[in-house]
Amino acid sequence: MPRPSAGSHHNDKLHVKKGDTVIVLRGKHKGQTGKVLLALPRDAKVVVEGVNLVTKHVKPSAANPQGGIEQREAALHASKVALVDPETGKPTRVRKAIVDGKKVRVAVKSGKVID
């Protein structure tokens, strides 16, 4: 039986999900905000709208006969983003709480229910 690789210990859970508004905390895109377009929990990455744009060379195909060069969002590591507090507009951590018998996410800084 093969040994698992050193990087295979993953949690498969993220603190953000698709549709959340997040702010980038580190790197060259620090301070930019956007909506999460795609969450990749197995890789611990997220794709944020308008952030970390890369140039992609596209070959001509039936769907795109012209081909060409286009800009796309690339994935960021989930640890580099934080949820934007709906009340203050600043980055916040997230806590889970049970409200009316339902498990919801709560902003740590303001205590406001996120979903």
Swiss-Prot record:
PROSITE patterns according to UniProt: RIBOSOMAL_L24
Tagged with keyword Ribosomal protein: yes
Gene Ontology biological process terms, A to Z: translation
Gene Ontology, cellular component aspect: ribonucleoprotein complex; ribosome
Record-level Gene Ontology MF annotations: rRNA binding; structural constituent of ribosome
Keywords: Ribonucleoprotein, Ribosomal protein, RNA-binding, rRNA-binding
A matching Pfam family: ribosomal_L24
Similarity comment: Belongs to the universal ribosomal protein uL24 family.
Subunit structure: Part of the 50S ribosomal subunit.
Function: One of two assembly initiator proteins, it binds directly to the 5'-end of the 23S rRNA, where it nucleates assembly of the 50S subunit. One of the proteins that surrounds the polypeptide exit tunnel on the outside of the subunit.
PANTHER family the record matches: MITOCHONDRIAL RIBOSOMAL PROTEIN L24
HAMAP family reported in the protein's UniProt record: Ribosomal_uL24_B
Protein name: Large ribosomal subunit protein uL24
